[in-house]
Amino acid sequence: MIKKKFYIENYGCQMNISDSEIVSSILNNKGFIKTENLKEANIILINTCSIRDKSEKKILLRINQIKFIIKKNNDILIGILGCMAYKFKNIKEKKLINLVVGPDSYREIPNLINNFFKKKGEYISTSFSKTETYADIIPKREEKKITAFVTIMRGCDNMCTFCVVPFTRGREKSRDPYSIIKECKFLFKKGYKEIILLGQNVDSYLWYGGGLKKKFKIKEIKNEEIINFSKLLELVAISVPLMRIRFCTSNPNDMSDNVLNVIKKYINICKHIHLPVQSGSNRILSLMNRKHTCEDYILLINKIKNIIPNCSLSCDIITGFCNENENDHNETLNLMNYVKYNFSYMFIYSHRIGTYAYKKLIDNVSLSTKKRRLTEIINLQKTHSYYRNRKYIGSIQDILIEGISTKNINFFYGRNSGNDIVIFPKKNYKIGDFIKVKINNCTSATLVGDIYV
C-alpha cells in the first residue's frame, strides 16, 4: 500500500505553529509522510485562526484557491484544524472541506483520515477534553531551526467579551511540568538555542496533578505539591542554563512578583514581557471584561521597571471596540505615552461569533473611525519604538543569530534579550551563534550594529 502524503498550511499564532508540529508527529507515527509540496499531497490540512474576521476571510479564500488547484479530485482530502473548527461542525453544509478537527482532538486525525478514504464513519471531531495537553508527544519540528515552541498550557478561563479563544480552545488546563522539562532538555541536546513557553495565559499555569484549572481546590492539596508559573519558569531556567527562555502570553491580572523576581534572577530568561492591555480606558476595559483597570496596569508596569529596570515591554491594543468614543481612544494614547512600549500588536476590533460582545454589545464604531484611530495608534507606536531603539545606540548587546537579512544577504539578523531585531555584517559566524554586537544606528523597527570582539 502506498503511504499517503500530508501537507499542513498554518495560520495564526505561535500556538498554532506548535499544534501543527504536534499533528505532524501524530501522522508520522501512523505512517503518513509529510510533504512541503501541496500538489503532491493526498491530505491537505489547514490549521486555522479565528481571532479576527480578516483572518477567517483569508483562510476561506485560501481554501477556495486550493479547491481550484486540485480541481475535482475526490481522492484528495481537505481538512480544517484549529480555531475555525467550531464553525464547521455541520460539515454537510460546507462543500469546501472533508474533515474538521478541533484543538483537543488531534489524536483522532489518523482514524478520521482513514474513514474518509474508506468512505465510512465520521470525518469530524470538535469536542473539548478536560485533560488533553499532548504532553507525551514530541512535536515534529522543522530541521535547522534554532528556536522551538513548547506549549505549557491550553485554553483560557478569562472570558474577555471580545475573545473567541475559550469557545475555540476550551478552558484552561496545564501540562505536566516534568514533561515540559524533559522536552526542553531534549531540545537542548538536539541543538536548539532558544525555547518559547506558550500558553493563552502563561501566568495562569497551575499544575496540581492534571485537569481543568477551574476544578482546582487549594484545600485538597499541599502547597508544596503545586507548581505555578514562577516555579515552572525557574525549573526550566535551571534545567537548560545554556538556552534562552522566552514566554508568551501574559495577562496583567495574573502576573505575580514571583515571576518578575525569577526573570531578574536568571540570566538565561530574556528580559522581555508581552503584556496585552487592549485599551487605556477603564470604561472599555470593563466592557471587555478585563480584570484589571488602567491604574492596576500602570502599577504593574512600574513594578516591572523597578524589579527589572532594562525589561523590554510590548502589548496588544484593540481599537474601535463596542461603544468606544474619542475620550476612550485618547486615554489609550495617553497610556501608550506613559509606558512607551518597545513594540505593539495593534488591531481593529471585529465581532466574533459566540462571544459575549457578539451576543450583547453593538459593533457601533464605524470602519472609517476604526481605521483612523488605528493609524494614530500605529504612528504613536512608531515614535515610541524609535525612542526606545535610540537608547540602545552605543550599547553592546548579546545577540542570538537567527538568519540572513531579507534586505541584504551580506547581513545577519538576530534578537537581543529584549526581543528587539538587530542586523549586522555576517563575518565568520553562523546561524545559532551567540555574539556581541555594538549598536550604532536604528530605525523604529530595527537596531543596526557591528560585531563586537
Swiss-Prot record:
Molecular function per GO: 4 iron, 4 sulfur cluster binding; metal ion binding; N6-isopentenyladenosine methylthiotransferase activity
Record-annotated MTTase N-terminal domain positions: 4-118
Every Radical SAM core domain range: 142-388
Textual note on the cofactor: Binds 2 [4Fe-4S] clusters. One cluster is coordinated with 3 cysteines and an exchangeable S-adenosyl-L-methionine.
EC identifiers of the protein: 2.8.4.3
Catalytic activity: N(6)-dimethylallyladenosine(37) in tRNA + (sulfur carrier)-SH + AH2 + 2 S-adenosyl-L-methionine = 2-methylsulfanyl-N(6)-dimethylallyladenosine(37) in tRNA + (sulfur carrier)-H + 5'-deoxyadenosine + L-methionine + A + S-adenosyl-L-homocysteine + 2 H(+)
Keyword Metal-binding: yes
Family annotation (InterPro entries): Elp3/MiaA/NifB-like_rSAM (IPR006638), Methylthiotransferase (IPR005839), Methylthiotransferase_CS (IPR020612), Methylthiotransferase_N (IPR013848), Methylthiotransferase_N_sf (IPR038135), MiaB_methiolase (IPR006463), rSAM (IPR007197), rSAM_horseshoe (IPR023404)
UniProt keyword list: 4Fe-4S, Cytoplasm, Iron, Iron-sulfur, Metal-binding, S-adenosyl-L-methionine, Transferase, tRNA processing
SUPFAM superfamilies: Radical SAM enzymes
Domain of life: Bacteria
Entry binding sites for [4Fe-4S] cluster 2: C156, C160, C163
Main function: Catalyzes the methylthiolation of N6-(dimethylallyl)adenosine (i(6)A), leading to the formation of 2-methylthio-N6-(dimethylallyl)adenosine (ms(2)i(6)A) at position 37 in tRNAs that read codons beginning with uridine.
Subunit record text: Monomer.
Protein name as catalogued: tRNA-2-methylthio-N(6)-dimethylallyladenosine synthase
Organism: Karelsulcia muelleri (strain GWSS)
